[in-house]
Amino acid sequence: MTAPTAIRRLNAADPDFAHHLDHLLSWESVSDDSVNQRVLDIIKAVRERGDAALVEFTQKFDGLEVASMADLILPRERLELALTRITVAQREALEKAAARVRSYHEKQKQDSWSYTEADGTVLGQKVTPLDRAGLYVPGGKASYPSSVLMNAIPAKVAGVTEVVMVVPTPRGEVNELVLAAACIAGVDRVFTIGGAQAVAALAYGTESVPQVDKVVGPGNIYVATAKRHVFGQVGIDMIAGPSEILVVCDGQTDPDWIAMDLFSQAEHDEDAQAILVSPDAEFLDKVAASIDKLLPTMDRATIIETSINGRGALIHVRDMAQAIEVANRIAPEHLELSVADPQAWLPQIRHAGAIFMGRHTSEALGDYCAGPNHVLPTSGTARFSSPLGVYDFQKRSSIIFCSEAGASELGKTASILARGESLSAHARSAEYRIKDDVKGN
């Protein structure tokens, strides 16, 4: 008989609850000086030696015999071939998911705007897509085609001219679903490179890999470290932490459903976090029993158990109002409101990457095909960050057009402020445009 899981139990009424909650939520990515130095060395090599460095690192890290960079380029025809190599059901699922993701993100598009003042001055904002975006996709059999859709489609909807995907093929392992997803999502170019060297190539460009304006997509510690180092040279989406789910339940949902919802994030990796908050203590016991019952049936039981025991929790609260307070304190990546009337509580939710409303809305639907993006802020960063979206691939420029009368009137204000800052060139630049009949100073 399998031993019961050791998931921690917390009670919001305990005087030291805040301390225990802080301890539960604390997570720091591995800080490894040796990794940092290796990444810096790799970036330096790619900047100095370009394609030659990429070929060398691919041979070294991916175990491939590569004669030249030409061996690391996948033509569009190869992506189209992948569509024929997956099952009909898989292709239909990818196409349906892509259509829903595209439809949702179309609603996020921002348009340029302007307005004209009485004197003819025009002020506005010009929205422009990035020229080129780079998408990092983890390689091998563990890569996720859904991530290709979630990263590439918003870029294409935004109007990005070229989306460049990098995906390693360790020991020659090619994930046909990933390539098929790239084809459906409209990825323009694909290079079978990975690791810090791929991030460096996207950020600085090589003879074959074009330089991009922004790098998005998940990866291991080498990829994350490389993204930190190239930020500023290019934009990045985020440095993501472990996956998280917080379920707020009134105690009326099937406990097996809730246990499986917790598993859906815990199975990602040992550092993933799954938390249930409820005012019903007996319900927490029922979910604990469901966890013990269902865990042995899971393909990734060992990973789930490590995650649940190490970073999971069942939290008892006074009432639903306190449950919402705890949710806002945690600011989770995924928040399920598994309650009778989720709409009533929605206005009180301030911090969450994605909010799943009602008992029938499992987090897994958002991961794959609901439509909203599954690239979400983690580790409490939902306090100030948002899901990946079309706006991440667009930039805004301010538009200012001054009529003669407008320049004259604004010039008087600018002159006073500039001289107050002892910036006389600023002042005189504005003063030159003040009409003669109103100067007099």
From Swiss-Prot:
> Where on this chain does Zn(2+) bind?
265, 268, 367, 426
Q: Name one GO molecular function term.
A: zinc ion binding
Give the keywords, sorted. Answer: Amino-acid biosynthesis, Histidine biosynthesis, Metal-binding, NAD, Oxidoreductase, Zinc
Q: Name one GO biological process term.
A: L-histidine biosynthetic process
The disulfide bridges present are: none
- Catalytic residues, chain numbering: 333 (proton acceptor), 334 (proton acceptor)
Which superkingdom is the protein from? Bacteria
InterPro entries in the cross-refs: Ald_DH/histidinol_DH (IPR016161), Histidinol_DH_CS (IPR001692), Histidinol_DH_monofunct (IPR022695), Hstdl_DH (IPR012131)
Pathway given in the UniProt record: Amino-acid biosynthesis; L-histidine biosynthesis; L-histidine from 5-phospho-alpha-D-ribose 1-diphosphate: step 9/9
Q: How is the cofactor bound?
A: Binds 1 zinc ion per subunit.
Source species of the chain:
Pseudomonas fluorescens (strain Pf0-1)
Name of encoding gene: hisD
Obligatory cofactor(s) = Zn(2+)
Q: Enumerate the HAMAP family for this protein.
A: HisD (MF_01024)
Q: Where does the chain bind substrate?
A: 243, 265, 268, 334, 367, 421, 426
**What is this enzyme's catalytic activity, as reactions?**
L-histidinol + 2 NAD(+) + H2O = L-histidine + 2 NADH + 3 H(+)
Which EC class is this protein assigned?
A: oxidoreductase
Q: Which family does it belong to?
A: Belongs to the histidinol dehydrogenase family.
The name this protein carries in UniProt is Histidinol dehydrogenase
The protein's role, per its UniProt record: Catalyzes the sequential NAD-dependent oxidations of L-histidinol to L-histidinaldehyde and then to L-histidine.
User: Which Gene Ontology cellular-component terms appear in the entry?
Assistant: cytosol
> Which residues does the annotation say bind NAD(+)?
136, 197, 220
- The EC number on file is 1.1.1.23
